[in-house]
Curated annotation (Swiss-Prot):
Transit peptide: 1-55
Protein name: Mitochondrial escape protein 2
Compositional bias annotation for Acidic residues: 555-565
CDD domains: RRM_Yme2p_like
Domain RRM: 224-297
Entries under InterPro entries matching the protein: Mt_escape_2_C, P-loop_NTPase, RBD_domain_sf, Yme2_C, Yme2_RRM
Mitochondrial intermembrane side: 335-874
Gene Ontology MF, one: RNA binding
Record carries keyword Transmembrane: yes
Gene Ontology BP terms: mitochondrial genome maintenance; mRNA processing
Main location: mitochondrion
Lineage start: Eukaryota, Fungi, Dikarya, Ascomycota, Saccharomycotina
Family statement: Belongs to the YME2 family.
Coiled coil: none
């Protein structure tokens, strides 16, 4: 047996490692190492006066030299706690204050809310004395606290006790530490205090300060690891364990080598704090070793970021999916709520007009506004400067006479809504015919029930959006979709490119505008459904309550399903008004019409809403029929006002001086027809002082200029129509009220397959109007009544007539020449075949060539016959 002894003598005040013995039979492993070690008992020697010679270390000498002339040598200035070790002892109490593990630790600020943690110095003194004393073992009366040095960052306090004459330092320290433990045991026996003491506010502990503590307030926050530096000889791992184990459980000790510091890893941060404050500055090994201790910041490993960095192809899609899920769960309920408010107008100011508190503010405001308006009206009546309101009439006066003849259509529209049978209604009419006012003002908003749930969508505002972000913002504004983050589109595109470069696949974060709009309309459908079924829960409760009252009655009412409930209560369903719906649009936003038609058809098929579509375009029916192929759509057609209503409207808008020209008005109103926009423009011109004839002539001249600039411009190559086609329509409509589509198709200019699309485009621009019969195009008429006079003005102008008539004949000649060229090619091919076999075909081709040649000759004669004289077209 071999026994190895290691003795460390005089290793500082109160520490002596007596014997370290390891014994083992003479048996070595294959590696030549000792198999096991037995640690014998460690004995601690009492304090010796010789060990205190270097107790103060060199820091105190530096302090004395630097502060030899300084008056204030307190701990806060020097960082050194100086005391007479013969007459005083220093102890460290932990958990007096909440300690901070970082600069942004929330606990240090949260605990300040409680009065127990906002203690003054007197409170701390009293608390320390209570901890140090018990009823069985009270402190001697001559023991008092000489100085109290708080360490708020570490959560503890250094307490300097006066040493009584009847006790030694060892006895006083043992008494205080024992009393503190007994108080902790008594405190933990209280109800619910023990578990809470372990979780939240630990009971303070007491340790003797063995070294020279460095009282510093640097940004070095406590951690479970301590860095131990040695000045002089190093300590072994066993010696470090003996020195630090009393403060708490140690997980690991790294003794280091050379100049590297040793690292001690405690299980709890509380133990590390006590060890650092009590041991730092201690002198061991007869003054040959001085220990300096600092907190070692933990290098925390973030496994999440490590996983993301090492597994990008897996982590990035997961992160994006989580972000998308979080966005859906957070923002979609908010957006749905805003959509519901936009449809129901529940929080609009109009809904609070009967509130008594609001009336206290609104009634004085309304009275002052009436006084101001009456003053304006007085001056307007005196100086004749009455203005038109948004309807074209005088302020305070609406043109109800124009709507008297449409009263039956308003009744029919309301009847269809309350019938609740496939409420997909189409209101047609030319621009300026008052479709919006008929539906919104006279049908819905005047109704106290239907006007409560109304969603208005202007397709023109969506189609005219110049960018994708503008389209999304416009759609969100009309739907009430809030919040919307359009700036994320640009960021998502960059992120998508970056992810594709890193992982080789797209992240799917960026979405097309079509997908985003579908999501917005889908969320709107969900909000509309909630609004429609808002009172369904109350209905079920009322039926169940009635059943309980009528128990045993076989005639009790059955609970209707959601679809049956909405079928029997059409007033519960919101009304969706889609304005300015068209078949197609110029630009990249053309898809919006098809998307809205499919969305509205889904609402009608799901029995969630009434849909009313306002359109002036016949081509829009293609989207609607494809969205609802098996349903008959209800339609209301609006035309211009009658001549009598138009005359009555103009007379009501004119002042007394202008009414003297009533006889001249009748002849001027006939070319204007009943188009509201033209009537309002005519009234404005007469109010400005123009005579009726001059106003009409100027309006016709502007319309003619608009036609020649936009429709008859030869420089425009983007138009689908030709100048000759438009001029032919102008000539025919200037002479007739309407043209038969069958007759028009016989003209060479309209024999091409795209003639119908050209006519639809011209109708969209309000030049002509297409009238269908049983879904088939029947006649073509003028788009605006004013255009009829403009057509006649253009045809009657000799110069304009000669220019466009010659262009028309040249176009016809070009068509015939192209036809002859094809026939000549065919004739050349037939020449190589036996004439007896293709004699009939040769005769047919030759006759066609002769007929086309005769037409060309006739067209050329007409061109030569054109003169600058007045046109004889009429």
């Amino acid at each position: 047996m071999i026994r190895t002894f290691a003795t460390i003598a005089n290793r500082g005040p109160g520490i002596r490692l007596a014997t370290l013995a390891a014994s083992r039979n003479l048996g070595y492993s294959s590696g030549g190492r000792i198999s096991s070690v037995r640690i014998e008992k460690l004995r601690f020697s009492p304090f010796r006066s010789s060990t205190s010679l270097r107790y103060t270390s060199d820091i105190q000498h530096v302090m004395q030299e630097a502060d030899s002339l300084d008056v204030n040598n307190s701990v806060s200035n020097t960082g050194v706690l100086d005391y007479d070790r013969k007459n005083a002892v220093v102890l460290y109490f932990d958990h007096i204050y909440p300690f901070s593990v970082s600069r942004y630790s929330w606990k240090q600020y949260f605990t300040l809310l409680f009065p127990v943690n906002r203690c003054s110095e007197d409170d701390i003194r009293e608390r320390v004395m209570n901890l140090s004393s018990t009823e069985k073992e009270p402190l001697p009366k001559d023991v008092r606290i000489l100085e109290l040095v708080p360490m708020r960052r570490d959560g503890g306090v250094f307490v300097k006790f006066q040493l009584p004459a009847t006790m030694s330092a060892r006895e006083l320290v043992g008494l205080i530490c024992q009393n503190t433990k007994e108080n902790e045991q008594a405190y933990g026996e209280r109800f619910l205090v023990g578990p809470l003491n372990k979780i939240w506010n630990h009971f303070p502990r007491c340790f003797q300060v063995k070294g020279t503590p460095w009282i510093e307030d640097l940004r070095r926050f406590p951690s479970v690891k301590l860095s131990v530096k040695f000045e002089g000889e190093r300590l072994t791992e066993e010696e470090l364990y003996v020195l630090f184990r009393r403060y708490g459980l140690i997980i690991d000790i790294a003794p280091g080598s050379g100049t590297e510091p040793a690292v001690i890893h405690f299980r709890k941060i509380r133990s590390a704090i006590c060890a650092k404050n009590c041991v730092t500055g201690i002198t061991l090994n007869s003054g040959n070793t001085v220990v300096h201790i600092q907190y070692l910041p933990l290098k925390r490993v973030n496994y999440i970021t490590d996983f993301i960095g090492n597994h990008q192809r897996i982590a990035i899609p997961i992160i994006l999916a989580l972000l998308a899920t979080a966005a859906v769960f957070i923002f979609d309920p908010i957006r749905e709520w805003f959509i519901m408010q936009n449809v129901s107008h529940r929080h609009a100011l109009d809904s609070y007009k009967d509130n008594k508190f609001l009336k206290l503010v609104s009634l004085p405001y309304e009275q002052v506004r009436r006084w101001i308006d009456s003053g304006y009206d007085y001056f307007d009546s005196k100086f004749g400067c009455d203005e038109e309101d948004e309807f074209g009439g005088e302020k305070g006066e609406a043109p109800n006479d124009l709507w008297s003849e449409r009263y039956e259509k308003v009744k029919q529209l309301k009847l269809w809504i309350y019938e609740n049978i496939n409420t997909f209604i189409i209101v047609r009419g030319p621009k300026g015919s008052g479709k919006e006012e008929l539906v919104l003002e006279h049908t819905l908003r005047d109704d106290p029930i239907l006007g409560n749930k109304l969603l208005y969508i202007d397709c023109e505002a969506l189609v005219k959006s110049r960018s994708d972000n503008a389209l999304i913002e416009a759609t969100a504004q009309q739907l009430g979709y809030f919040p919307v983050f359009t700036w994320t589109n640009s960021i998502s595109q960059f992120v998508d490119l970056g992810v594709q470069g890193l992982t080789g696949q797209k992240s799917g974060l960026s979405e097309s505008k079509e997908t985003q709009l579908k999501n917005m309309f889908g969320l709107t459908s969900s909000a509309i459904r909630k609004l429609a079924l808002q009172d369904y829960a109350k209905y079920k409760k009322s039926v169940l309550r009635q059943r309980r009252r009528q128990q045993g009655d076989s005639t009790s009412e059955d609970i209707l399903s959601e679809d049956e409930y909405l079928s029997q209560h059409p007033e519960r369903k919101p009304v969706i008004v889609i304005d300015k719906f068209a078949g197609r649009a110029d630009g990249d936003q053309d898809f919006i019409f098809k998307m809205i038609s499919e969305w509205s058809a889904q609402l009608v098929q799901s029995n969630l809403a009434h849909v009313i579509i306002l359109t002036h375009d016949v081509g829009s029916m293609s989207h609607l029929t494809s969205a609802l192929p098996n349903q008959v759509m209800k339609s209301i057609s609006l035309s211009d006002a009658s001549q009598r209503s138009a005359r009555h409207y103009v007379l009501n808008q004119l002042n007394k001086e202008s009414q003297a020209q009533v006889n001249e008005l009748d002849s001027c109103l006939e070319p204007l027809g009943g188009r509201m926009l033209d009537l309002q423009a005519f009234v404005r011109r007469m109010r400005s002082g123009e005579a009726p004839g001059d106003a009409l002539e100027e309006m016709v001249s502007q319309a003619s200029e608009q036609i020649t600039t936009f429709f008859l411009s030869a420089s425009s190559t983007q138009n689908s129509w030709s100048t000759a086609q438009v001029w032919l329509l102008i000539k025919l409509l200037a002479k007739q009220e309407s043209i038969s589509y069958e007759t028009l198709c016989h003209d060479p200019l309209f024999k091409s397959p795209d003639s119908l699309s050209i006519l639809s485009t011209l109708e969209k621009h309000d030049l002509i109007s297409l009238i269908s019969d049983k879904g088939v195009l029947n006649t073509v008429s003028t788009g605006r009544p004013l255009y009829k006079a403009a057509f006649r003005s253009l045809v009657e102008d000799p110069k304009i007539f000669r220019i466009y008539e010659e262009d028309l004949y040249n176009k016809l000649i070009a068509l015939e020449n192209a036809k002859i060229a094809k026939l000549e090619d065919e004739f050349a091919k037939l020449a190589s075949v036996d004439a007896r076999l293709v004699r009939n075909r040769l005769d047919y081709v030759s006759n066609k060539i002769v007929a086309s040649t005769d037409k060309i000759t006739d067209y050329e004669e007409k061109i030569s016959g054109l003169s600058s004289k007045k046109s004889s077209w009429f």
